[in-house]
Amino acid sequence: MKKFLIALAAVITLVACKSKDDNDTPNQLIGGWKLESITDNNQPKPLTECEKNVIIYSATETEEIFFKDDGTGKCVYDKDASIEKRPYRVRGNIVIATNPAIQQDYPAEFAIEGNKITFKVKATTQSGQTNRVLVFRKLSPQELTEIEKLKNN
């Protein structure tokens, strides 16, 4: 499970960085997005509620928020797994992220339809290379406020 979350964090990191000088970012990207599903090579991956991380995009940065089960079935903020704010950039329908540790760019195709955003990436799993599709749902302002409260507790 931990390897899955690390892989998920890596994939999300790949799609979640932007530079301040990029002016073609769709305004629709800005806001909070909650993971709904992951598909690897057309095979759905089951997710618990606590595995449904949140990405928050501002005009210049993104932040990834992860959760864990507190042992009672309640999802709580996982500070250790969450990723601090990072810059990102967008070119058309491609989000380009840079892994700051190795300075390598990772592109991911994205599409926004209504309140859903879909990312398509090449991911490396234990069984090799996979075509991964991640679908997120846009959070309401109230849901975003609740996420911020979880972070601050």
Regions found by a protein language model. Name each.
Residues 1-4, 18-19:
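Positively charged n-region of N-terminal signal peptides that target proteins for export
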Residues 14-16:
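C-terminal motif of bacterial Sec signal peptides marking the signal peptidase cleavage site
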